[in-house]
Amino acid sequence: MGARSKARKRALDILYAAEMRGEEPATALDRAIAAGEGPTNDYTSDLVRGVVEHRPRIDELLADYSEGWTLDRMPAVDRNVLRLGVFELMWADDVPDAVAVTEAVALVQDLSTDESPGFVNGVLGAVLRNKDALTR
């Protein structure tokens, strides 16, 4: 697993744990860093802070492109992987779009339901197809 793949997994861990605790992700990140358990890769922090900064727009896009699913109905892992994927597609200009989608699908393949890879691929694919028309 490459450095950025590990950073994505660690960012997912932080986002997921924060959601389960009812904590803000940035607070969870800062707490982990202060406790010496923080990410060793700056990209993890970039991902968590990016998702936090753009979360209203990310969640709006997910609501628009997750046909038949509300954010609340999605498994928490899928929801947070999708947030990471949309962030990378829309705001991480140094990440190729195909890599953002592939990495998101790989995360849910390992950590979520059997249906999750197809769902995540479909949602991110729809965002990607419409990316040029979407406002950041």
Residue ranges and their predicted role:
Residues M1-R136:
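N-terminal interaction/assembly modules
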